[in-house]
Amino acid sequence: LLWKTFHFWEQLCTPEYYTDKEGQPHYKKGKTFLEDGERYLIIPSYSPENHPIGYTSTITANAAMDIAAASDVLRMIRELEERIGDERSTERLTACRELAKKLPEYQADETGGLKEWSLPQMRDNHEHRHISHLYCAWPGVETQHDVRLAESCRQAIRNRNTGNVGKDDTASHGWIHKGLVAARLKDSEGLGEILRLLVYSDIFYSSLLTDHNTDRCRGVYCTDTILGLQGII
């Protein structure tokens, strides 16, 4: 299954769509290999339900979530093949390392926060509940070995919390997702704020089942919070 997923990313990435040394996107029909400093452009790409400022479509390019998902698959294959250690493993390890070197790099905005789309033309829209671009922290594990990336993710959460006040910030799954990421980042202060917000909100019914929203504005049962809290702890 992992190797089939490798082929998905290998086939999605084509030298015809690439970024140059400055990170600018290009399309060149018939291009068959990447030059030094060039990287694949992941297109089409998707960051759930959100789009960059000035865009109307959620279909974009170089979504950080896709970069992280591809990186995570390559990591799992490497760990598995290193344990197997046969002749086929050597070939697969080489293929994984080659693809990993050509994947897009994460980018940070002017605040140092991880960008949701790794292209200079795409500005993050913080008026949104999702933080799917922090896949590299959770469920991925890249931030466990990269201090700079971890801090960039912490700043990204702060940016989203500030930019989404009074917008769609009552969606419980958004806060649970932030809590899972904060816990993985060992951000005790940020996690404490999230837990207090949830526990002292109006999200719990008398049965202790939880609503979809912290203010119960829609009256919809949702297990995201009641189960997510346990996952965070």
Task: Specify the residue positions occupied by each region the protein language model found.
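Short amphipathic alpha-helical surface micro-motifs
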Residues: T5, K21-P25, W117-M122
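Active-site core of glycosidic bond-cleaving carbohydrate-active enzymes
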Residues: A63-G231
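The feature captures the catalytic groove of carbohydrate-active enzymes
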Residues: L1, E10-T94
